[in-house]
């Protein structure tokens, strides 16, 4: 029974985090979904309601913010969530370097974009992990600013970038998760999707997106078609 439960939970975890419209969800939001499923199907999770409340109300879902909440409450579920998150970061660092690499076409695409565009990383991942990976693969030289988990939500990060005077009609958010599209929509900027399991194709076509962005032909039919294809890819 335990083996079956673990298998079902892992499949559910992968569905939530990788292969559905919740792809790219913040790790703590994903954890709440998983633990809620455990509580509903298998056994009670001590202190879960406090973790749920923190995830729903915290302005920043990160390890430092969680550390502060642990100090303030001493809640067992918050403590375990922090230990888990720290273990995730440690595991990421221990991954064999050959297993962590950009998809084919990423470097060429970013280099091409940076010839005529400013590039900002807007990520919900850990800052140190993002910086290390982009540096290791020679991508950081083509980036103008790094905004990661500690900088706030993707929506707020784009909002901050727009205060530097960028024309919304010349801004494109590129990403593989619904949260990326949502952040773009809420800021009134365009969205170019990287399709899961079709990453090579997506990066090969990003040049057309750049050309349309600069020519003012991104809006309308082209943008609508990109979004439709993106949603279908995660809901089929």
Task: Label every model-predicted segment.
Residues 1-61, 65-66, 207-209:
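Conserved phosphoryl-transfer catalytic core
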Residues 8, 30, 50, 65, ...:
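Exposed alpha-helical structural elements
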Residues 9-17, 70, 81-91, 156-158, ...:
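Generic hydrophobic, helix-prone segments enriched in Leu/Val/Ile
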Residues 34, 54, 69, 87, ...:
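Residues that form generic nucleotide/phosphate-binding pockets
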Residues 42-104:
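Metal-dependent phosphoesterase signature
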Residues 98-118, 126-236:
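C-terminal cap/substrate-recognition subdomain and adjoining C-terminal extension
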Residues 123:
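Conserved phosphate-coupling serine/threonine residues in phosphotransfer and NTP-handling enzymes
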